[in-house]
Amino acid sequence: MKDRMGREIDYMRFSITDRCNLRCKYCMPDGIDCMPRWDVLALEEFEAIAIAAASLGIKKIKVTGGEPLARKSCPQLVKMLKNIPGIEKVTLTTNGVQLAQYLDQLLDAGLDAVNISLDTVDPVLYEKITGRDKLSEVMKVIEKAEDLPVPVKINAVSIDFRQLQTGTKTAGLSPQENWQQVAELAKRYPVDVRFIEMMPIGYGRQFKTIDHNWLLENMKKTYPDLAVDSTVHGFGPAVYYKASGFKGSIGLISAIHGKFCSSCNRVRLTSQGHVKSCLCYDEGTDLRSILREGQERPEEDTHYIWQAGRDVRDEKLQEKLREALARAIYEKPAAHCFEKPGEITEAHNMISIGG
């Protein structure tokens, strides 16, 4: 369906957990408490929302977290979403640490593509950023990308990480050195490497994003024959470039310095069941209250269990979900205001909103 600005909204991101096995400094550093288990949607609740979304024209769903594979039932959810009429693509964004373990299950479930979040290929810096020594686990999947039946993309946040490196043997690894090392993955493997400007939300406010105008200028100096790649790579806002000898492409997602709000096609669903139509604003439509109408929170914190015999396609339930979701989509803000920090009203961290 179209929002009030006439934009076609056909893409939804489902955050299925706020838990993660890494502790990235700009997202979920040590010391953050996870939300109560009961607050997180059950698989059937995601399914019910996806059915309503599909009836409104949502065709593509990205499963995210937190780290979605921290939820062992992630492959089951992918299969459930793929079986919904109208949902054409289901993809996954993961930090890649457990991807090799779950890859066969995800492919059997019908997963269409995978994005791996990876900000550096330097082992020491990786551990500084994430708090974990897990780079080798991530590289296992990237190194066999050529043999996979689905596209693989690498997402790297554009930050000057030197502020994390004081006292390490890689202290001073410059943005130029870091982005080039990551970009080389697209040369060695058939993967698209996308650099993403840091969203000034939550802990991300402490880190200054690298201007993608600077990055593109340096890319052109490093790869003189770099040219725009007009091939369709997905359904996101990245602008892609290709250099000779590269198996993959390099993409720039420039939310700050290349504002693309006029063509934004997405809304987000948090793991708590709130629809967010723009990352910049602390506004959301509560779908969980519709799904759990009349049910009381238990005294003990346990996972919410969908009631046996309750139909996710119940027409009254679906009507309420469609009405609330349609309102959230229609009222999507015209644009973010990330370039004006004083006007940003979103106070939550990305880990609780969803990547």
Which role does the model predict for each range below?
Residues 40-63, 70-192:
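Radical SAM/AdoMet-radical enzyme domain recognition
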Residues 4-43, 56:
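Canonical Radical SAM [4Fe-4S] cluster-binding loop centered on the CxxxCxxC motif
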Residues 1-11, 181, 187-188, 198-355:
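Auxiliary Fe-S-binding modules of radical SAM enzymes
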Residues 22, 123-124, 259, 285:
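Glycine-centered loop/turn positions within well-structured domains
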Residues 32-36, 122-129, 202-206, 286-288:
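A short acidic, helix-capping loop that chelates divalent metal ions and anchors anionic groups
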